Design a protein with these regions (language model features):
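Conserved N-terminal subdomain of the carbohydrate kinase-like
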Residues: 49-134, 156
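Charged helix-capping and loop-helix junction motifs
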Residues: 144-149, 175-182, 205-211, 245
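Structural alpha-helical scaffold elements that stabilize or flank donor/cofactor-binding regions
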Residues: 122-123, 183-184, 216
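Glycine/threonine-rich flexible loop motifs
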Residues: 136-145, 173, 201-203
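Helix C-cap/helix->beta junction micro-motif
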Residues: 46, 154-158, 187
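Conserved phosphate-binding/catalytic region of the ribokinase-like
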Residues: 3-5, 152, 156, 205-246
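Glycine-rich phosphate/adenosyl-contacting loop at the front of the ribokinase-like
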Residues: 1-75, 98
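Structural recognition of alpha->loop->beta junctions
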Residues: 70-74, 175-200
Length: 246
């Protein structure tokens, strides 16, 4: 069994080899994208055993994703191949002003059909930690239920829960998911968020105040707050440390 398990969406990213608008048909290279798959890969590169649970389409893009994740030493036995839905794809566009635009083709994707039945409870409960993000629960109602169920499995098995809100307002559309995000944070053992996400969810960019709010009444053990070029903060309920940027 793996020490770390990540659960959520992965996609194929088509990245242009040079600057140019999509309408001019730039050449693309194919890469893997997705916070959860990237986390599983990063943990494996650091020498930890990791497993990735997701759902992909029965297509060439899905085959590519499995091959790339497996090549990094990640256990892919928890990946479900969906014969009825396609693998999600994203295109990046580097515009003349060097601004990057991202175009998603993920509606009704295989990953959006991920459900509790795709998750082996024993894998979650025998792991040291399970990692989830706020992207998965806004993809669909079944994804949302799956995230809650995985957290319940982890709590029952005394597995630590790592959560990154990873807020993407484009995915939220007209729905209000802030209460849900706060609820998921309260269920988590370790939380990583950006300073702007803290402001959006809790109304403050004061890290000490943010920590005071998050450590009250929940299961939280550790909080990491990122602030780009300014570095990051990490804290428990007693200590707060600033980590300078690399």
């Amino acid at each position: 069994m793996s020490r770390f398990v990540t659960v959520g969406e992965t996609m194929v990213a088509l990245v242009p080899k040079e600057q140019g608008l999509l309408r001019y048909g730039p050449d693309f290279s194919m890469r893997i994208a997705g916070a959860e798959s990237n986390t599983a890969i990063g943990l494996s590169r650091l020498g930890h055993t990791s497993s990735f649970i997701t759902r992909i389409g029965n297509d060439g893009f899905g085959d590519f994703l499995i091959r790339m994740v497996r090549a990094e030493g990640v256990d892919t036995s928890g990946i479900t191949v969906d014969k009825d839905h396609r693998t999600g794809v994203m295109f990046k566009e580097i515009r003349p002003n060097m601004e990057t635009a991202v175009h998603y083709y993920r509606d009704n994707s295989a990953a959006s059909c991920l459900c509790t039945g795709d998750v082996d409870e024993a894998v979650i409960q025998k792991a040291d930690m399970v990692h989830l993000t706020g992207i998965t629960p806004v993809l669909s109602k079944n994804c949302r239920q799956m995230v809650y169920d995985v957290m319940d499995m982890a709590v029952e098995g005394k597995t630590l829960i790592s959560f990154d809100p990873n807020i993407r307002k484009k995915l939220w559309k007209d729905e209000e998911f802030r209460p849900m995000m706060k609820e998921l944070i309260n269920k988590s053992s370790c939380v990583m968020m950006g300073l702007e996400e803290g402001l959006f969810l809790y109304g403050t960019k004061d890290v000490k105040r943010l920590a005071d709010m998050l450590f009250k009444g929940g299961r939280l053990r550790y909080l990491a707050v990122k602030n780009g070029a300014e570095g990051a903060w990490i804290c428990d309920d007693q200590h707060l440390f600033h980590i300078p940027p690399w």
